[in-house]
């Protein structure tokens, strides 16, 4: 198996690139670090974040599995997505807030789930703008504050 690169804790916080079907490791790693049974969504990401803090994580670019979502999959439940992101933030808050790129990536992901619950991601856009005050992020925050962001998001999802 060719290993392409090492993945750091901060890289994994910024981009969730793991699924349970693709994690390979020694049994002792998984006996030491367990799934958080209370995590309603992103259990693979939560587990990987815990593992990467203690063990070296590498990835291989080659596609090794096909993944299919079933109709009743938890990935189709946006409320669980919002709660899962909240729990990840509570656990990794300091690391997330230490890097504006991680803040933006993390809260954009959370905002997408908020929009799917038919709410505006005002708080998420506010945090993004606070940590990365660009004109674009101000406009996104303003759109969310005015209640328009979710409509634009949902229109974009249809195309």
What are these regions (language model features)?
Residues 1-84:
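Conserved nucleotide-sugar donor-binding catalytic segment
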Residues 63-159:
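C-terminal subregions of glycosyltransferases and related glycan-biosynthesis enzymes
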């Amino acid at each position: 198996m060719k290993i392409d690169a090492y993945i750091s804790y901060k890289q994994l916080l910024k981009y969730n690139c793991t699924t349970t079907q693709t994690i390979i490791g020694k049994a002792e790693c998984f006996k030491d670090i367990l799934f958080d049974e209370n995590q309603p969504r992103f259990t693979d990401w939560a587990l990987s974040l815990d593992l990467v803090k203690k063990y070296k994580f590498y990835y291989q670019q080659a596609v090794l599995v096909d993944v299919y979502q079933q109709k009743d999959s938890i990935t189709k439940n946006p409320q669980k997505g919002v709660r899962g992101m909240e729990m990840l933030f509570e656990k990794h808050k300091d690391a997330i807030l230490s890097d504006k790129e991680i803040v933006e990536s993390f809260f954009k992901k959370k905002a997408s789930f908020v929009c799917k619950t038919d709410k505006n991601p005002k708080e998420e856009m506010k945090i993004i703008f606070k940590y990365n005050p660009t004109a674009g992020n101000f406009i996104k925050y303003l759109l969310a504050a005015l209640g328009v962001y979710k409509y634009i998001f949902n229109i974009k999802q249809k195309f």
